[in-house]
């Protein structure tokens, strides 16, 4: 009997092994849906971004007006732009949930997969920042000025590095052109890294809610999880499109609807909501270099998790004290997001500093707590 084409054709065989005959644990919950949702988000962002790039001009004289032109004159351009802007917010929401699930269920023990995942997170954050600059509104210009200026904290090379990135002595036309170039290319690099992420994941197989070896109880990805993912896609698209039609500007900054003016500084400079937790950590450190290091560490610290793992069981579901600590961490991250949007004045400065200490202390207390719980069980 001849084998099916999907099992013999070189290209189809790869797709088959990843999406059809992939052995998957039978008990993975809805928290495992966010990986496929991130794939959907990336496709939405690349497609909407591609059509927006056809009408956008990366020039400081016309960038703001070209976005206006997309809204007013391009057929369904308003939908493309709002879908792209809100799609980014949904992308980051799914990313944070995906990372949170990895931390909760100790998925970071698949070290290569986890490391590539953290690199993807950095890349997506870079892409998001570059995209925020492109409409060339007030917050775009001043956000770019403030964030790129952080590189001046690098000892010895700082000033040259900033001017090299700007392409001059201030954020100007050269800056906008190169930011657009990198914003266009980075999603494709993220797509390539996603393939590597999946490649490493399929070497080991997925983790599951029990944290046990599930080789004795695996089922094919299709039809079971394909349909489960499709249900997730439908719910996600329903929420995203509802959000686009009803709350289209809720997550955008009103300042960014004013054309960029280098002579007028906004009252409060802030990035998009998905960077606010890291921005709050940056502002909490009085020293410039220390703030930049803390900013990078707020994400990079995820890379130390596999090496600080001390628990005998896999996942926080077996550690009640660690569960309390984890959800406390979620609240701390949410409060940091809120603090990042507040002005730099008391009591917000002190609150931000306390929350920053609590944020980083999680990564120290969590392994100690799980070790203590294991000792209690003995």
Curated annotation (Swiss-Prot):
Keywords from the named record: Electron transport, Heme, Iron, Membrane, Metal-binding, Mitochondrion, Mitochondrion inner membrane, Respiratory chain, Transmembrane, Transmembrane helix, Transport, Ubiquinone
Main location: mitochondrion
Location relative to the cell: Mitochondrion inner membrane
Cofactor note: Binds 2 heme b groups non-covalently.
Superkingdom classification of source: Eukaryota
Residues that bind a ubiquinone: 202
Topology class, membrane: Multi-pass membrane protein
Signal sequence bounds: none
InterPro entries linked to this entry: Cyt_b/b6_C (IPR005798), Cyt_b/b6_C_sf (IPR036150), Cyt_b/b6_N (IPR005797), Cytb/b6-like_sf (IPR027387), Cytochrome_b (IPR030689), Cytochrome_b_C_euk/bac (IPR048260), Cytochrome_b_N_euk/bac (IPR048259), Di-haem_cyt_TM (IPR016174)
Biological process according to GO: mitochondrial electron transport, ubiquinol to cytochrome c
Alphabetized GO MF terms: metal ion binding; ubiquinol-cytochrome-c reductase activity
GO cellular component: mitochondrial inner membrane; respiratory chain complex III
Record flagged with keyword Mitochondrion: yes
Purpose: Component of the ubiquinol-cytochrome c reductase complex (complex III or cytochrome b-c1 complex) that is part of the mitochondrial respiratory chain. The b-c1 complex mediates electron transfer from ubiquinol to cytochrome c. Contributes to the generation of a proton gradient across the mitochondrial membrane that is then used for ATP synthesis.
Subunit-level organization: The main subunits of complex b-c1 are: cytochrome b, cytochrome c1 and the Rieske protein.
Miscellaneous: Heme 1 (or BL or b562) is low-potential and absorbs at about 562 nm, and heme 2 (or BH or b566) is high-potential and absorbs at about 566 nm.
Family of the protein in this entry: Belongs to the cytochrome b family.
Listed name of the protein: Cytochrome b
């Amino acid at each position: 009997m001849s084998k099916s084409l999907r099992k013999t054709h070189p290209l189809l065989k790869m797709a088959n092994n990843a999406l059809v005959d992939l052995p998957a644990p039978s008990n993975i919950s809805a928290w495992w849906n966010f990986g496929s949702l991130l794939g959907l988000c990336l496709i939405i962002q690349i497609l909407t971004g591609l059509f927006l790039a056809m009408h956008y001009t990366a020039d400081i004289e016309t960038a703001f007006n070209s976005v206006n032109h997309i809204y007013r004159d391009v057929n369904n351009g308003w939908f493309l732009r709002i879908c792209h802007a809100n799609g980014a917010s949904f992308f980051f929401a799914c990313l944070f949930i995906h990372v949170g699930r990895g931390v909760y269920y100790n998925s970071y023990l698949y070290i290569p997969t986890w490391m590539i995942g953290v690199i993807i997170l950095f890349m997506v954050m870079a892409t998001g920042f570059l995209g925020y600059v492109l409409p060339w509104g007030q917050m775009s210009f001043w956000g770019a000025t403030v964030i790129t200026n952080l590189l001046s904290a690098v000892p010895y090379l700082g000033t040259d590095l900033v001017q090299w990135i700007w392409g001059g002595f201030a954020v100007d036309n050269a800056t906008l052109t190169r930011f657009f170039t990198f914003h266009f290319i980075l999603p494709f690099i993220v797509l390539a890294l996603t393939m590597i992420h999946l490649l490493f994941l399929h070497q080991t197989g997925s983790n599951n809610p029990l944290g046990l070896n599930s080789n004795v109880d695996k089922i094919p990805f299709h039809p079971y999880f394909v349909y489960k993912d499709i249900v997730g896609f439908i719910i996600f698209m329903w929420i995203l499109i509802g959000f686009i039609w009803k709350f289209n500007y809720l997550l955008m900054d009103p300042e960014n609807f004013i054309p960029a003016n280098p002579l007028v500084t906004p009252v409060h400079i802030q990035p998009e909501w998905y960077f606010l937790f890291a921005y709050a950590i940056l502002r909490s450190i009085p020293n410039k270099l220390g703030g930049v290091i803390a900013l990078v560490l707020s994400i990079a610290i995820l890379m130390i998790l596999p090496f600080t793992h001390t628990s005998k069981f896999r996942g926080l579901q077996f550690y009640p004290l660690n569960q309390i600590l984890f959800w406390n961490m979620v609240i701390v991250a949410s409060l940091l997001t809120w603090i990042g949007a507040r002005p730099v004045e008391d009591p917000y400065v002190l609150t931000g500093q306390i929350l920053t200490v609590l944020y980083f202390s999680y990564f120290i207390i969590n392994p100690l707590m799980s070790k203590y719980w294991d000792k209690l069980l003995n």
